Design a protein with these regions (language model features):
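Internal alpha/beta domain cores that form substrate/cofactor-binding pockets in large enzymes
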Residues: 15, 32, 38-42, 46, ...
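Conserved AMP-binding A3 loop
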Residues: 121-148
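Conserved AMP-binding/adenylate-forming
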Residues: 2-45, 161-167
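ANL superfamily adenylate-forming
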Residues: 67-117
C-alpha cells in the first residue's frame, strides 16, 4: 500500500532494478499485490541494450538501487517516461522517496486488489542472445496457467508450498 500511497497506480509499468535476492523477490511480489506491472530486464545484456529495453517498455515508475538512479540521471532519454522513483538504499540528488519511506507510509492490513485474467501482469525481456532483446507482456491469465501446469506436473497439493524462482 505504500507504493500506491507514493503515487503508483494499478496497471503502471514499474522498472525494477535491484540485485537479485530477497529484496528483488519481495519487491516484485509487492508490485503484483499493488496491481502494478513489474518490468524486469537482465542487466547482464550490457548498458546499451538495457537502455534500449527501458526506452521500449516506457515504464511510469522505477524502483532501483542508487547506481541505477545515477544512470537514469546521466541518460535521461531512456528514462523519459519515468514519473515516480523509489530508491532502494541511500538517495542522493534525485527525486522520490526511499524504500524505507515507502514502507513507513504503507498499511500492514492492505488487501490485494482484484486482477483479471487478461490484465497485464509483467513485462519480461528476452536475453537478446539471438537478436535484439524484446519485451514480452505477460497477463495474469498466463501466469495463472503456468502455475496450474506446474502444480499438476509436480503434484503440488493444497496446503503444500513451493517457490520456483528465476534461474
Amino acid at each position: 500500500s505504500g507504493l500506491l500511497q507514493s503515487g503508483m497506480k494499478k496497471g503502471d509499468r514499474v522498472l525494477l532494478m535491484v540485485p537479485y535476492g530477497t529484496k528483488f523477490v519481495t519487491l516484485a511480489f509487492a508490485l503484483f499485490k499493488a496491481g502494478a506491472v513489474p518490468v524486469l530486464i537482465d542487466p547482464g545484456m550490457g548498458k546499451k541494450n538495457v537502455l534500449h529495453c527501458i526506452k521500449q517498455s516506457e515504464p511510469r515508475g522505477i524502483i532501483a538501487i542508487p547506481l541505477a538512479h545515477a544512470i537514469k540521471t546521466l541518460t535521461p532519454s531512456a528514462f523519459k517516461s519515468i514519473q515516480l522513483s523509489v530508491t532502494v538504499g541511500r538517495k542522493w540528488f534525485w527525486s522520490g522517496p526511499t524504500l524505507d519511506q515507502v514502507k513507513r507510509n504503507g498499511q500492514t492490513d492492505y488487501q490485494m486488489g482484484e486482477t483479471l485474467e487478461d490484465e497485464s501482469a509483467a513485462v519480461l525481456f528476452t536475453s537478446g542472445s539471438t537478436g535484439p532483446a524484446k519485451g514480452v507482456l505477460y497477463t495474469h491469465g498466463m501466469f495463472n496457467q503456468q502455475t496450474r501446469v506446474l502444480r499438476e506436473h509436480f503434484g503440488i497439493l493444497p496446503g503444500k508450498k513451493d517457490l520456483p524462482t528465476f534461474p
